[in-house]
Amino acid sequence: MKVRANEHIPVALERTIELLAPALSVSSPYLIDATIGLGGHTEALLEKFPALHVIGIDRDKSALEKATTRLARFGSRATVVHALYDHLSQVANNQGVSEVHGILFDLGVSSMQLDQSNRGFAYSLEAPLDMRMDQSTGVSAGEVINSYSHEELTRIIREYGEEKFASRIAARIIDARKAGPVTSTTALAQIVKESIPAATRRTGGNPAKRTFQAFRIYVNNEIEVLDRAIPTALELLAINGRMVVLSYHSLEDRIVKRAFTEVSSTDVPHGLPVEPKPARYQLLTRSSEGASAHEMEVNPRAQSVRIRAIERRAA
């Protein structure tokens, strides 16, 4: 049965468990769920591995409340912490944990965030232009949209949305502001629609998707945070520990690919008569994997997922 796009079904759950299983089959494994969200992946992992302890991190306080309730039956085996995932080493240390056997990142916007009309993540719902994962800090998308210059808006939309009509969209935003602030998601979506040629609008899904992605990424500093988090997470893995990352757009996937490639390669140039030192990490996915055809059919959010995994080897 096909589910609604905003219904919470963990993406790539079976593949995630399969990739993490060898690392979690030790006597007392620890895993960090760096983006615990509503706790779907963590719940399944705690059920599958009775000795597992999970430290779950999220910047979204609303999600943490729901995850805490969902995971209450596991008692002390599940610890939920409000933090950014580039702080996961500090979070682990605060819990008395120096290394972990598994780490999971499920990046992007959760189904709950899309479903909450006051968050501003969904271009199909009337809502204030917020887009902050943590609404207690930082500037909202509305503040950015209504105060930044044409050049700044163009850069954000082009760099984080990979939108070729970035300059046209920024110009129309500036023009719309003359009549008053752009305050709602539907107003922004309409501005984007009017900025893109009709022929282009007829292909590739909703034309506002890339612009909304751009402002969400910028407001939450997602790329910079992820760029810091992945190397930190790799160092936190125990020998034979494994990390799985689920990403949903090319900007995220490129960061993960680059970090994984760097640590899984030797530093000796090819062709030199030198015995290379073995790499400290081994790729478990040669390239990024997608969801199965069946999962994409029943869970719309899985359609864009890219899965990468890596294992720490003996030094």
Protein language model regions, located:
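S-adenosyl-L-methionine-dependent methyltransferase catalytic core, i.e., the SAM/SAH-binding region
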Residues: 1-315
